[in-house]
Amino acid sequence: MSNLPRDLSDLPRNMAEEVLSRVPMTSLRRLRFTCKKWNTLSRCRSFAKKHLVCQAKVAAKKREYKVVMMMDFRVYLMRINLQNNVELCIKRERELLFPDASDQIYVRHVFHCDGLLLCIMKDNPRLVVCNPYSGQTRWIETTNNPQRLDAYSYALGYNSSTKSHKILSFGMMFDYVSSTSAEFKIYDFNSDSWRLAVLFQRMDTLQMEIWVTTKIEPNTVSWSSKFFLSVDMRELTGRYSMFSFSDASFFIDEEKKVAVVFDKGKKK
């Protein structure tokens, strides 16, 4: 008995993980403020996965599930019980709060990936990423047109090689002068910046070049010192062929140094 810790905060890490993983998510946040070590542990990525697995097993036994739901442009954590015939089978546990927001915010879309939530604002060009476990939030500035927020779509993903999340922004613009144009941008969490790839083709030599930004700010754009890819299109097509200004699109794989270009009306 003398070898047992006198204080719960002195528990070994593996034992503390086992204890905290059994605590419901709604109570976990209150426990963080009682112990600095527990607060640090609960923000760990490995613990978040363990907590998810443990809570999923408990919910499966009760046939009870937790989901993220949007109502009236608010984001809530909901509890659904499929065996409860007396009380309400759907209960609202808590609202997702944004402590760094000065005004009431309204969410238009929510995306989930590996424990993080990407929230797209209804009337604000900024994005916010929230970790429901740690309570951390990150506000992300964009260069999107605030008058055309509905023209942009987003996706949240995780890159296992760099161990970092990324956000894909896709915008489809249309006007009567230049027809339709597409815009793709990637936000990298490690560098805390957006990245943009631009395809440039010379009219005289048909040389195609793809350049990638290193940083995008509201009034400044920085480019890599060397182009990502350069190709002599005459060797591929054997004739004079220019990509369309408005109908062509492309994507690149930086690791494999590969680019794929799509052009409307072209067979290759």
From Swiss-Prot:
PROSITE patterns: FBOX (PS50181). Disulfide bonds: none annotated. Residues 5-51 form the F-box domain. SMART domains: FBOX. It holds the Pfam family F-box. This is Putative F-box protein At3g23420. It comes from Arabidopsis thaliana (Mouse-ear cress). The lineage of its organism: Eukaryota, Viridiplantae, Streptophyta, Embryophyta, Tracheophyta.
